[in-house]
């Protein structure tokens, strides 16, 4: 289903990502911001509590927001646990979720897949909304057909709660789909300090860096005989994610199943 104007509710509008999403919706002619979900400021106008031109009302109860504003889409940019809860509630109310939080397990995704099938509406969960990061993952999967030794180094700001990042895990998953699991490095290698070689997913080593001054960065490093290949993406501000959010909102109106990963809607 495609509508001329897409009515949107945003969860977490005052956060760093959420405030960018508010700007995106306000600046997009065929988007309409009809409500927001926040922990505080119940029933106040968004424009009264943050820099915004919107008169959309803030709700601390997500079900009240849905019943009173009837959004088509929920953009959720909160935390992993809240994001999981909001996604389920949205689907139960016939609202299509576009979710930028990570931490969804395979069982979580299976449950949500059943719910989208039952409701006949779409949902998009994306570990990363930056289109460049999505292309990095796709290019890395292509490269893994030719280079089987690979490690992933992801770097994020020091307020990020999960490690490794959802993008790193998704990248490793995509590489594993075309590469047999293998043990990398010397078979007798020993970690002098536990964890020095990073986390292990199907033989792929994942390394996480957390420092102030960073936003979101990832390098996928492949090694072969006499050569290396590095595929890197850097997000220098959170505006870099908004083109992917816009694409996801538009695409979620056209699908009737759960899509995990923005790479699955990029042709």
From Swiss-Prot:
Q: What is its EC number?
A: 1.17.1.8
Gene Ontology MF, one: NADP binding
What CDD domains does its record include?
DHDPR_N
Q: Report the domain of life of the source organism.
A: Bacteria
* Keyword list, A-Z: Amino-acid biosynthesis, Cytoplasm, Diaminopimelate biosynthesis, Lysine biosynthesis, NAD, NADP, Oxidoreductase
Enumerate the Pfam families for this protein. DapB_C (PF05173), DapB_N (PF01113)
Pathway annotation: Amino-acid biosynthesis; L-lysine biosynthesis via DAP pathway; (S)-tetrahydrodipicolinate from L-aspartate: step 4/4
- Residues of the active site are 156 (proton donor/acceptor), 160 (proton donor)
One of the GO biological process terms = lysine biosynthetic process via diaminopimelate
What protein name applies here?
Answer: 4-hydroxy-tetrahydrodipicolinate reductase
**Species per Swiss-Prot/TrEMBL record:** Bacillus licheniformis (strain ATCC 14580 / DSM 13 / JCM 2505 / CCUG 7422 / NBRC 12200 / NCIMB 9375 / NCTC 10341 / NRRL NRS-1264 / Gibson 46)
Q: Which gene encodes it?
A: dapB
């Amino acid at each position: 289903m495609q509508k001329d104007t897409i009515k949107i509710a945003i969860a977490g509008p005052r956060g760093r990502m959420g405030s960018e999403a508010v700007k995106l919706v306000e600046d997009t002619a065929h988007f309409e911001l009809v409500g927001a979900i926040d922990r505080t400021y119940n029933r106040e106008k968004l424009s009264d509590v943050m820099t915004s031109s919107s008169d959309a009302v803030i709700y601390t109860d997500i079900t009240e927001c849905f019943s009173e504003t009837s959004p088509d889409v929920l953009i959720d940019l909160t935390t992993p646990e809240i994001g999981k809860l909001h996604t389920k509630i949205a689907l139960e109310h016939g609202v299509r979720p576009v979710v930028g939080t990570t931490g969804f397990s395979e069982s979580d995704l299976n449950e949500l897949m059943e719910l989208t099938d039952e409701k006949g509406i779409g949902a998009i969960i994306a570990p990363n909304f930056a289109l460049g990061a999505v292309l990095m993952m796709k290019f890395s999967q292509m490269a893994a057909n030719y280079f089987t030794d690979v490690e992933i180094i992801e770097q994020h700001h020091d307020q990020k709660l999960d490690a490794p990042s959802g993008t790193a895990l998704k990248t490793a998953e995509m590489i594993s789909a075309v590469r047999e699991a293998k043990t990398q490095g010397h078979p007798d290698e020993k970690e002098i300090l536990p964890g020095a070689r990073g986390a292990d997913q199907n033989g792929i080593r994942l390394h996480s860096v957390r420092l102030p001054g960073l936003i979101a960065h990832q390098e996928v490093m492949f090694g072969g005989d006499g050569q290396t290949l590095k595929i890197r993406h850097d997000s220098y501000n959170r505006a870099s994610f908004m083109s992917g959010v816009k694409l996801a909102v538009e695409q979620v109106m056209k699908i009737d199943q759960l899509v995990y990963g923005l790479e699955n809607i990029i042709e």
